[in-house]
Design a protein with these regions (language model features):
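Residue-level preference for short coil/turn positions at secondary-structure junctions
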Residues: 68, 113-114
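Reverse-transcriptase-like RNA-dependent polymerase core
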Residues: 6-32, 75-85, 112, 121-152, ...
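Well-ordered alpha-helical segments embedded in enzymatic catalytic cores
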Residues: 46, 50, 104-107, 164-171
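Short, conserved loop/turn and helix-capping segments at secondary-structure boundaries
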Residues: 99-103, 136
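Short strand-loop junctions, especially beta-strand C-caps/beta-turns
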Residues: 37, 154-155
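Reverse-transcribing Pol proteins
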Residues: 1-100, 147
């Protein structure tokens, strides 16, 4: 199976075959524009490299101008890599959430009872496989010391991202 579908396991970014997602904001919402967070000198190059990696993968794109801007920072991980985090709290306060039921682990484990084998798969960059429509890309603009970048894919930190992702996964199954 790995040999037959080796392109699915190469570590690259996949593309969920669904129409681009449109994020909905509450009526009369004005764009939210924040200043960039200061980045400690020790982390500047690391953050810049992570942004460039995400641009190369097609997750981010340099934004020429946007009325929206959410600040971004990095959190070092124990394995030496970093997680880029965008502070979407102000955007989230203006988004309309459409809750989708997210299954509880305990329920899933009960369904597996009696099986002799189980497999765990990690969907590499799962949210990033879902494209955003142009208006949502604009709303998901981040600001850094090097300018603005817009997310082309569903970013982590958007309050409705888990609902959107779970709905797509449930429909896939």
């Amino acid at each position: 199976m790995l040999n037959k579908y080796n392109n699915l396991f190469d570590g690259s970014l996949g593309d969920f075959n669904v129409p681009p997602i449109k994020l909905e904001v509450k009526p009369n919402t004005e764009p939210v524009h924040s200043r960039p967070f200061p980045v400690p000198h020790i982390h500047r190059q690391t953050l810049y490299k992570e942004i460039q990696r995400m641009v190369a993968l097609g997750i981010l794109e340099k934004a020429s101008c946007s009325a929206w801007a959410s600040p971004t920072f990095i959190i070092p991980k124990p394995n030496g890599t970093v997680r880029m985090v965008s502070d979407f709290r102000k955007l989230n306060a203006n988004l309309v959430r459409k809750p989708y039921p997210i299954p509880k682990i305990s329920g899933i484990m009960q369904e597996l009872e009696g099986f002799q084998h189980a497999t765990a798969l990690d969907l590499n960059m799962g949210y990033y496989t879902i494209r955003l429509d142009p208006g949502s890309q604009d709303m998901c603009t981040i600001i850094t010391p090097w300018g603005k970048y817009k997310y082309l894919r569903l970013p982590m930190g958007i309050m409705c991202a888990p609902d959107i992702f779970q709905e797509k996964m449930s429909n896939l199954m």
